[in-house]
UniProtKB/Swiss-Prot annotation:
Keywords: Ribonucleoprotein, Ribosomal protein, RNA-binding, rRNA-binding. Part of the 30S ribosomal subunit. Forms a tight heterodimer with protein bS6. GO terms for biological process: translation. Transmembrane segments: none annotated. InterPro entries: Ribosomal_bS18, Ribosomal_bS18_CS, Ribosomal_bS18_sf. One of its GO terms (molecular function) is small ribosomal subunit rRNA binding. It holds the Pfam family Ribosomal_S18. It comes from Cereibacter sphaeroides (strain ATCC 17023 / DSM 158 / JCM 6121 / CCUG 31486 / LMG 2827 / NBRC 12203 / NCIMB 8253 / ATH 2.4.1.) (Rhodobacter sphaeroides). GO terms for cellular component: cytosolic small ribosomal subunit. It comes from the Bacteria. This is Small ribosomal subunit protein bS18. Belongs to the bacterial ribosomal protein bS18 family. Binds as a heterodimer with protein bS6 to the central domain of the 16S rRNA, where it helps stabilize the platform of the 30S subunit.
Length: 75
């Protein structure tokens, strides 16, 4: 009996949909989830964020860093 091929479920963007949170540079708790423990922005292939929302997220993180709401690097 042949085994069925493994089906990887497609990830859904956490920022698209009705109840999705808005990307805001002042919401540091939300932005913190998309930053690694070293302070780098986590890529979208890991977080499943769409390309458009990843650009918005990166801009919000960079703005929050500039305003000293988030650190540039963690030691």
């Amino acid at each position: 009996m042949a085994n069925k091929p493994f089906f990887r479920r497609r990830k859904v963007c956490p920022f698209s949909g009705d109840n999705a949170p808005a990307i805001d540079y002042k919401d540091t708790r939300l932005l913190q989830r998309y930053i690694s423990e070293r302070g780098k922005i986590v890529p979208s292939r890991i977080t499943a964020v769409s390309a458009k929302k990843q650009r918005e997220l990166a801009a919000a993180i960079k703005r929050a860093r500039f305003l000293a709401l988030l650190p540039y690097a963690v030691k």
